[in-house]
Amino acid sequence: MGTEDAIALPNSTLEPRTEAKQRLSSKSHQVSAKVTIPAKEEISSSDDDAHVPVTEIHLKSHEWFGDFITKHEIPRKVFHSSIGFITLYLYTQGINYKNVLWPLIYAFIILFILDLIRLNWPFFNMLYCRTVGALMRKKEIHTYNGVLWYILGLIFSFNFFSKDVTLISLFLLSWSDTAAATIGRKYGHLTPKVARNKSLAGSIAAFTVGVITCWVFYGYFVPAYSYVNKPGEIQWSPETSRLSLNMLSLLGGVVAALSEGIDLFNWDDNFTIPVLSSLFMNAVIKTFKK
């Protein structure tokens, strides 16, 4: 009996010591948790006020409409197309197209500065994207806005080419490119690819809209509003060209398809389409002058 009691006594004395150590360690964990958690909360809240990560930016329009607006880019296409109609209206009102050049340059400078600010200030980038996000692609959150390339292409055309060539290049960018993107996304998988991210279906759409655009502009608007054109502003006319209206329109469709389909140094097509279409259309008209 004495031996058993002697053996039992150490066990009985060790158990309270073990429990005491466990209680002390649990208390130390609780104390450290109480100390560290508020510190993390304070740090994270102060960081959030100063820096908003670009990866946390979400476009409101994409959240509201989900994959539909992301896939079909409805507001962006409406914006692109509307520029063509607005320009056509200004043409009928006799606005001097050369007077548009400086407003385009000012717009480019302002938007470029805004992009520099937003790409270096995440909080401003978040506000900017939530304001005009419906007109942006997701990749443009992290890089320069496509509108910059759009304006730069128009500056090139308005500065170096005649009135009709400049307007045609803008119409092809507004309407042929929109048609190519819409049809290409819908039916492009059914046709062969003609270039990187370019399908035969999209090229056919660009060609068709290009033909219609040239025929309507040169066949109706130029003669109907001839009084708004100064001498030398319109390069093509039936009297000065070996091309008929129908042939010119067909070649205009080819220009639209080529300009939309060519991938030039992986540059943004908002820049390459007006530049290439201006160069091609100008070459076509001058080549067939009488």
Curated annotation (Swiss-Prot):
Post-translational modification: CKII-mediated phosphorylation of Ser-45 and Ser-46 regulates its function in the production of PA.
Glycan attachment points: N11, N197, N270
Lipid bilayer topology: Multi-pass membrane protein
Compositionally biased region (Polar residues): 23-33
A cellular-component GO term for this protein: endoplasmic reticulum membrane
Cytoplasmic side: 96-103, 162-163, 225-244
Region feature Disordered, mapped onto this chain: 1-33
Domain of life of the organism encoding this protein: Eukaryota
Regulation of its function: Inhibited by N-ethylmaleimide, dCTP, and sphingoid bases including sphinganine, sphingosine and phytosphingosine. DAG pyrophosphate, cardiolipin, CDP-DAG, and lyso-PA inhibited activity by 23-66%. Also inhibited by Ca(2+) concentrations of more than 1 mM, by addition of EDTA or EGTA at 5 mM, and by 5 mM Mn(2+) and Zn(2+). Stimulated by major membrane phospholipids including phosphatidylcholine, phosphatidylethanolamine, phosphatidylinositol, phosphatidylserine, phosphatidylglycerol, and phosphatidate.
Role: CTP-dependent diacylglycerol kinase that catalyzes the phosphorylation of diacylglycerol (DAG) to phosphatidate (PA). Controls phosphatidate levels at the nuclear envelope. Counteracts the activity of PA phosphatase PAH1/SMP2, controlling the levels of PA and DAG for the synthesis of triacylglycerol and membrane phospholipids. May be involved in vesicle trafficking between the endoplasmic reticulum and the Golgi apparatus.
Misc note: Present with 784 molecules/cell in log phase SD medium.
Protein name as annotated: CTP-dependent diacylglycerol kinase 1
